[in-house]
Structures are given as C-alpha cells and as structure tokens.
Amino acid sequence: MAIAAAASAKVTKEVVTIDRDKRPYYLFVPDSLDARPVPLLIVLHGSGRDGKSLVDPWRDLASREGFIVAGPDAADRRAWIAPDDGPAFLYFLVEAVKAKHAIDSRRMYLFGHSAGAGFGLTMALMESEYFAAAAVHAGALQREGRDQLLNARRKIPMAIFIGTRDPLVPLEAARESRDVLTARGFSPHLVQMADHDHNYYQRAPAINQQAWDSLKSAMLAEDPRYQIYSYAQRR
C-alpha cells in the first residue's frame, strides 16, 4: 500500500439515518488507500465543537499510516449522552462507513477529547468486543455507573493522555481511572504530559501519534460482537 506523506483528500460531511433521524458525521478517507481493508478510527469531539474539529487534526497521520477517520456530532454538542449518542448510534455509524469502504472490522478504534474522552472510555467498556481499543485525551471515567462498566466482557486496551496542568480534568481523576481499571484486571496506559493543560489542538500531532501508536497493534481475536442495551423510555 502506498501511503502519501501528507493529506490531500478532503473531509466530507456525511449523514447516517437511524429511525428517520438524520445524524451528521465527518469522514476522512486517504486518497492513497487501495481495496484492502484498513483500520477505522472513530473520534469524539469536545464540548461545543463538532466532528470535523477532531477529524481535521488526524488527516496527515491517517494518510501516512493508512486508516479512515470518522467524527460524529453529538446530539447536543455540549455533551455526549447515552443512549442518544451511543452505543447504538456509534454502531450504526460504523456500519454505514463499512457499507461504503473496506474496513478491517477487527481494528476499529475510539479516540476522544475532553467530553468525548469520558464518553469514549464508557463506550469502549460497553462495547469491548466491538471496538479493539481506545485512547483519550483530557478525560477520565465518570464515577457514576463505573462499577457496572468495569464488568466489561473483554479487557479492552485503553490509553489515557492527561496534562499535568489540566484545569478542567484533574490529574488525580485520570490516575483514579487508571487505578480502578487496573484493580479490575485491565492494563490501562496513563501518559502524564508535563506542563500540558487541556488544549489538545496545541499539541495534536504529537498526541495523535502517541495515541495511534497505542492503538494500532490492538486487534480483536475474532469478528466484532455488538452488545445491545435496553434503556428506559424517556418521558
């Protein structure tokens, strides 16, 4: 596979329809890809942003390494909320991409920043047999419902990148996430970034490279299994 040194392809805006509800997402497919299946990275944006804001910083790396990037919009851009934004929404999004492009279904990954980071960790645990691995920046596991999440069917690989000067997500919160995951048999990788704050975009190329290095070797041992959850109907 010939991989371009820099991205020339454009990010496109796509739509996935779920129960007549049209949800936008942004897609980057490197020009250099051939017909062989490639990994898929789902990126979850921070509060107040959109999917394109997180797809764009991944374009060059995706072109060099040869993978596809998809970034959905949260239903409410201020926060990612289950069940509106997943797991079902992410499943249908992935299946929509797979219907158009050759995806290595055993190498589908999650990356999230800030609000998308906490949600990314949650989705990774809920769908540990569907996604191969997850990496997040500036986020941690929510304490609410955490014990149930830790009963994940698979010890999915996870990496957490956190700035030592992050004013929004304390370093201790990331360390606590690492510790509770480790206590339950996971092997999380915590990267404490010295003199770094909450600003992902300031150091995006370096963060993305480290995140991808932590993700790319992870592979499901068998075809992905999507787990269906039941949620109480909202009034």
Model-derived segments and spans:
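A domain-start/cap signature at the N-terminus of enzymes
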Residues: I3-L40, D85, F92, A115-M123, ...
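Primarily recognizes the serine-hydrolase "nucleophile elbow" in alpha/beta-hydrolase
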Residues: L54, R106-R154
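Conserved alpha/beta-hydrolase "acid-adjacent" motif
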Residues: P167-A173
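Histidine-bearing beta->alpha loop at or near hydrolase active sites
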Residues: R77, M193-Y200
